[in-house]
């Protein structure tokens, strides 16, 4: 299989072909996802909750991300691999570049950062140094203490700010954007306005791609289950069939449905 590239995702957007992505944290699942046709994977700081058992993503370190990135890369050598820069890993441009280098050397093709227009200079600095960047707007889990919990973002007056943040990130050189827990109407406005691919999670079926935390997709998340999550394993019966069903429902626009969306 040829390596999956950012250019391929750009082509998907231009041709209006939806694509499925998912989080991965180890060799075995990365290989399974790649074998079944998910060719874009994220080593997310969500591992702090799903793998390490913390109540937020905040304790995750750059070293944690690098460790799991190496494992995922071994399992999916041709996948486009995104890696989160975790909490406080990009407080200054110098720190950001050093930490981005760590996860890129571990096997990432792109780093993902949470934040809006205030990150533009950092995104521009990375892009100028050949580090591809994926932005992340809406519900940004590293800011959970500021938001007062895991809540829908971008409603009311905040919608225009978030829209302008998206434009600023693209202008600064971001090549992908994740939108999390925002109203469908805002997600469509942003997706239509940007030339770069937009990946949604809790943003309706109007984005170019979708992403799920793998534990949510298989119904093994403990405690609160997000509204946007769907247990594909319950319907499919086995993990490989669940992955194929997830891909098919994303590509056809069946998932996410109205019951998984916000307004």
From Swiss-Prot:
- The residues listed in the UniProt record as binding Mg(2+), with positions renumbered to this chain, are 45, 84, 114
Quote the protein name from its UniProt record. 3-methyl-2-oxobutanoate hydroxymethyltransferase
**Species of origin:** Klebsiella pneumoniae subsp. pneumoniae (strain ATCC 700721 / MGH 78578)
The note describing how and how many cofactors are bound reads: Binds 1 Mg(2+) ion per subunit.
The GO biological-process annotations, alphabetized, read as:
pantothenate biosynthetic process
Q: Any idea where this protein resides?
A: Cytoplasm
Please verify whether the record's keywords include Cytoplasm: yes
Quaternary structure and interacting proteins, as annotated? Homodecamer; pentamer of dimers.
**InterPro entries recorded for this chain?**
Pantoate_hydroxy_MeTrfase (IPR003700), Pyrv/PenolPyrv_kinase-like_dom (IPR015813), Pyrv_kinase-like_dom_sf (IPR040442)
**Function, as annotated:** Catalyzes the reversible reaction in which hydroxymethyl group from 5,10-methylenetetrahydrofolate is transferred onto alpha-ketoisovalerate to form ketopantoate.
The entry assigns this protein to a family as follows: Belongs to the PanB family.
**Keyword set, alphabetical order:** Cytoplasm, Magnesium, Metal-binding, Pantothenate biosynthesis, Transferase
> Hey, which pathway is this one from?
Cofactor biosynthesis; (R)-pantothenate biosynthesis; (R)-pantoate from 3-methyl-2-oxobutanoate: step 1/2
